[in-house]
Amino acid sequence: MRKLDRKSVMVILMAVSCVFSFAGCQEKMEECDAKPVIYLYPESKTDVTVKLDYAGELTCTYPEYRDGWKVTASPDGTLTDADGQTYNYLYWEGENSVSYDFSSGYCVAGSDTVSFLEDALQQLGLTRQEANEFIVYWLPLMKENPYNLITFQSDVYTQAAQLSVDPTPDTVIRVFMAWKPLKDAVEIPAQDLTAPDRTGFTVVEWGGSQVR
């Protein structure tokens, strides 16, 4: 049996910690901002510092958030830390008491979740790979519900989770889905989904929160 090195053990412990933090978040009154992940796509290999000013408590981060993340980002999105460890994205999760905006959005049958998200995430500017990672994370929680009330947050979310990136990116896309399961369908004004063109150094974030 292969002996695990210290770095592998730390990664496993961090993953276990994240699982328990999410379970604890589900049991409390706070909303849980689950799996926001941050992708960095510079035009050339670049040293990048990312900081998060969050109106809540960070419960899990990977790699570990130590007064910010400092990584070397490659154009294909690969991130490398000072120890040479590589990552696909920066991950964080937290608890807050933010009241998300449900004044417009979509009421979607659970069985239609995949087709809805594929279309919506494309309109919001995610690549197929980014959308795939979003969908496989949220789909198991949504597909068996009779309906889901889905909204994509803008100012309410970005003010609660302010992102600072150095050097300054040319394009920032932040997709955050607040949603709640429903037994019956409801009427709600539809949102207008748009995205900026992805040009230059691009930063992409996606995440979500199941609201009670």
Language-model features: locations:
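Bacterial N-terminal signal peptides that target proteins for export
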Residues: R2-M10
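Intrinsically disordered, low-complexity segments enriched in polar/charged residues with Gly/Pro
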Residues: R6, Q26-E27
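Sec-dependent N-terminal signal peptides
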Residues: V9-S17
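C-terminal motif of bacterial Sec signal peptides marking the signal peptidase cleavage site
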Residues: S21-G24
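Protease-labile, long low-complexity intrinsically disordered regions enriched in Pro/Ser/Thr
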Residues: E27-R212
